Amino acid sequence: MSKMKDFGGGRDIISDLPDALIGHILSFLPTIEAVATTVLAKRWKPLLSFVHSLDFDDSLCLHPAKTNEEKRTNATSFMRFVDGVLALQGNARINKFRLNGKHIINERWVLDWIQNVLKRDVSDIRLYVSSCSDGFDSSFYHLPPEIFVSQTLVTLIIMFEGDINISVGREVSLPKLKTLHLYHFKIKLSTFNKLISGCHALEELMMINWKWDESSEPEPCFVTIYLPNLKILEYCRFERYDEANDKVSLLFHNPKVVYLEFFDSIADRYQQVSFGSLVEARLGIRLTYDQVYNHLETEYYVSSKEKSNVTNLLTGICNVKILYLSDETLEVFGCCRDTIPVFSNLIELTIQTKPHIIWKPLPAMLNNCPNLITLIFEGMHHIYSDRCEDEDGCLCRYPTNFVGGVVARPCLSSSPVKVLKILNFGEICDVHEDDEDDDDDDDDEDEEFVYCLRE
């Protein structure tokens, strides 16, 4: 009993712990809360040097601001706070540096912070930075080249809405890097190849909303993604710069990838597409503005070379089991439905529909999925055309036999599909309505549809 009383008798037990252990405990708190402990006693202030994980979030630090001047003052205060913590820690080793900054007024400060933590053998960098700049055409900030020769980095996630220009030195060496996420960036094709070739251990690669830097590039341009340990790949290029793909030849050879997201225009050439272990893929192939412009009625023009390119891409992923096709991909399939390969392993297919998309390629796709079990439609929208008056030309129209009975479509009656799901069932789509309003309506419709299924 005496020991129990000694243990809980109002003593400051935490302060009796070793400094390194206290620092480890503080590392699990948001950094602003860890810093707040320095007011407890003089002894606590130097303990910040033992905090090996820094987590800065300006939403936890800033007071609500009404005017732009107040917002700027708050943002400056937050950035000085980060500066102060880094200075207080000196050269102490750090494992993780995370920054969630929605009101950053000067991205160059952030680049300085990156250099600071790189010198301290950081293994995990995660930056989510919103910018005050006006869109994607703003000046591109250069990441410090030291970041691409780090011998300790395991995770690197950088999302700069103010845009990043990636340039590297003579070599790229990231021997321990397993996770790389890059958002809103510009890069030369030669630099991209050098970056990928220096990440031999990479297991997860995400590249979102980015563009090719076309300056001083030879033609044709070859882009190679060969990562033997890669398991997750998201390759989503910025739509506004589709013309830069006209001279790009892509090579994908990733035998261990199980999940793929690919959103891009049709490349000049798919030299090789190999995903031997692919389980799930989300595909968003889109037509360029020139291809859309050269349309005839509801058929869009693509050359025989572009048709072949699409076929090569699809052949490289045709062993997939779960596939999502965007509405734009369905549009592209309409131009090359006669060359769609067989998806022999596909068991679940999701189709996104929009009011401006035709369904003509869908029968060809279904006929090439011999083991399909689940078919999912995101909405039931399609464009109205002259073919909708033709019983043999529109998938959504029920043909009738000579006695007036309804006959199932051959592509549906011969399909092995056992489960049909329709998301947003009964949705009335008005292309003039705001997306936010549509989303609200979708929620209600989904709930009503689920209720009907349970009945």
Swiss-Prot record:
Pfam families named in the record: F-box, LRR_At5g56370
InterPro entries tied to this protein: F-box-like_dom_sf (IPR036047), F-box_AtFBL13-like (IPR053781), F-box_dom (IPR001810), FBL60-like (IPR055294), LRR_dom_sf (IPR032675), LRR_FXL15/At3g58940/PEG3-like (IPR055411)
Keywords: Leucine-rich repeat, Repeat
Residue ranges occupied by any F-box domain in the UniProt entry: 11-59
Keyword Transcription regulation: no
SUPFAM superfamilies: F-box domain (SSF81383), RNI-like (SSF52047)
Start-end of each LRR repeat: 14-39, 157-184, 190-209, 211-237, 322-353, 354-379, 396-424
Keyword hit for Repeat: yes
Gene3D superfamilies registered for this protein in UniProt: Ribonuclease Inhibitor (3.80.10.10)
Full protein name: Putative F-box/LRR-repeat protein At5g41630
Source species of the chain: Arabidopsis thaliana (Mouse-ear cress)
Lineage: Eukaryota, Viridiplantae, Streptophyta, Embryophyta, Tracheophyta
